[in-house]
């Protein structure tokens, strides 16, 4: 049989134009009854990126250097999880500091007069890649706006093998009114470098997720640094006014559209032309 008589086994998906609107794996096409080679290889590559993001060591030195260049101090601590293997199997240990870190933080806090308004914590979480890519540019925007509010800031506390709740202990030891932790989120197949922000009013050991506000997917392909800082500042202002955070504090920040229209809130799906 000549090749010219063979039917074309490759078929494109009619949803192909929608791929420009989302990184989701849609409209991949097919070859016979299978995926084409390119989408299959892309999937395997994305899976490898996600696995690597979980096990990539936390390069805290580069973040500390970047902070020093901006005149900001940092403090390196470690959770009670001794290494990555323990961290992944014992989430509870990632939520608390080890004894040496507790002593160091107490000594540091003893030098403060009064109360810190905002404790800033950075932890590797499940994606050190996210923290290394996005921490410095995001903090530049956040700290500029926080200082404009007249709030006092702690040194940036860098935590190895840390989970979200470790910020509660840090905030309590620093006697901070508020805490925010920047942490690498669990990698997905389209987002190995997604940064999460968790904000807490009156942080203290023992709080549950119900007392925290989360802003997720901070990255170039997701929520921009400026928009994330805008939403976080709104939550912090409201927390100071209402003395609470978590499920009782909703993000109702006004958002300026890309076209420069008037600020709007609510569900964009319900907006009319």
UniProtKB/Swiss-Prot annotation:
Keyword Lyase tagged: yes
EC number(s) given by UniProt: 4.3.1.7
Cofactor mode of binding and number, as noted: Binds between the large and small subunits.
Cofactor(s) the protein needs: adenosylcob(III)alamin
Pathway, per record: Amine and polyamine degradation; ethanolamine degradation
BP terms from Gene Ontology: amino acid metabolic process; ethanolamine catabolic process
Matches recorded under InterPro entries: EutC (IPR009246), EutC_C (IPR042251), EutC_N (IPR042255)
GO molecular function: cobalamin binding; ethanolamine ammonia-lyase activity
UniProt keyword annotations, A-Z: Bacterial microcompartment, Cobalamin, Cobalt, Lyase
Pfam annotation, one family: EutC
Physiological role: Catalyzes the deamination of various vicinal amino-alcohols to oxo compounds. Allows this organism to utilize ethanolamine as the sole source of nitrogen and carbon in the presence of external vitamin B12.
Name by which UniProt lists this protein: Ethanolamine ammonia-lyase small subunit
Phylogenetic classification of the source organism: Bacteria, Pseudomonadati, Pseudomonadota, Gammaproteobacteria, Pseudomonadales
């Amino acid at each position: 049989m000549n090749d010219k008589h063979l039917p074309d086994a490759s078929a494109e998906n009619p949803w192909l134009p929608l791929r420009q609107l989302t990184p989701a794996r849609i409209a991949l096409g097919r070859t016979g009854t299978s995926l084409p080679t390119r989408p299959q290889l892309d999937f395997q590559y994305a899976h490898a990126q996600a696995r690597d993001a979980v096990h990539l060591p936390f390069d805290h030195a580069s973040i500390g250097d970047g902070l020093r260049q901006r005149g900001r101090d940092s403090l390196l601590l470690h959770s009670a999880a001794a290494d990555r293997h323990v961290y992944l199997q014992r989430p509870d240990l990632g939520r608390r500091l080890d004894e040496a870190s507790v002593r160091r933080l107490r000594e540091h806090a003893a030098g403060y007069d009064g109360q810190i308004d905002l404790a800033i914590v950075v932890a590797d979480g499940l994606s050190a890649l996210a923290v290394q890519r996005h921490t410095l540019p995001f903090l530049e925007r956040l700290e500029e706006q926080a200082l404009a509010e007249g709030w006092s800031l702690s040194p940036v506390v860098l935590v190895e093998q840390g989970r979200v709740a470790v910020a509660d202990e840090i905030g309590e030891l620093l006697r901070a009114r508020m805490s925010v932790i920047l942490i690498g989120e669990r990698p997905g197949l389209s987002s190995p470098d997604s940064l999460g922000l968790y904000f807490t009013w009156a942080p203290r050991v023992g709080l549950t997720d119900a007392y925290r506000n989360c802003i997720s997917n901070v990255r170039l392909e997701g929520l921009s640094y400026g928009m994330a800082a805008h939403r976080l500042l709104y939550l912090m202002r409201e927390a100071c006014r209402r003395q609470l955070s978590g499920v009782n504090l909703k993000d109702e920040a006004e958002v300026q559209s890309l076209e420069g229209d008037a600020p709007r809130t609510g569900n964009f799906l319900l907006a009319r032309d």
